[in-house]
Amino acid sequence: MKKQSEVKRVSVNLTKRVRALFMGAALVLCLTTANYAAAQAGPPTVFLGSAGTFAVLAYAGVTNAGPTVVTGDLGTYPILSCTGLPTPCTGNGPGQVNGTINAGDVVAQHAQASLLIAYNDAKGRTTNPIGVAGDLGGRTLAPGLYKSTSTIGITGDLTLDGNGDPNAVFIFQIGSALNVATHGRIVLIGGAKAANVFWQVGSSATLGTYSAFKGTIMAYASITIATGATLDGRALAQNAAVTLDTNAVTKPY
């Protein structure tokens, strides 16, 4: 009887250990799956507040040359300068705005305040940053937070792959300037959307001639969109002007 009791006790203990091992393995699998899913989706989005309705927003005015088409609101605050666009801007064209023009009013003021918050949010992200430097042309990047301490260039195509997730977020922290070369492109694949791509630029951003860019640019200084370039996103300048020249700027949805 004593031997049977010992055998039974050993069997019970073994069963408990096996069960504990299975539970531990299941927990590790769940955590790994959750972490993988989070990595696939990238960081949380950047909330733009009232700046989100704007395709173009400047601090020191908006200047346009040529038949630019802006789809979304356009604003400037506190400097009211606005040329080459419809009234209330001076020149009454040749640019076109399919949205509301807010020149120096309280709406533009509130949008600038929201931009400051969004800019600082994007700049302050610190979770799992991926270091990048130099020219990003020719690369394919997954959702994530990308950090550069200096200037970033894009020559050729930079591909952003959403990995099948339409909510995948890409945030780029750029310590200095963003320079997109002539005919440089952002290519979105795998469900990636322009509305979920954010560029926090520590100085000025320049989109080269006939480039095709995607995402919301939040620049500390100026934004220049050269002749024939397109932007599926937003040009939001925190402390300087936005310059346009025969462009298509479309606020993403």
Where does each model-flagged region fall?
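C-terminal segment of classical bacterial N-terminal signal peptides
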Residues: 19, 23, 28-38
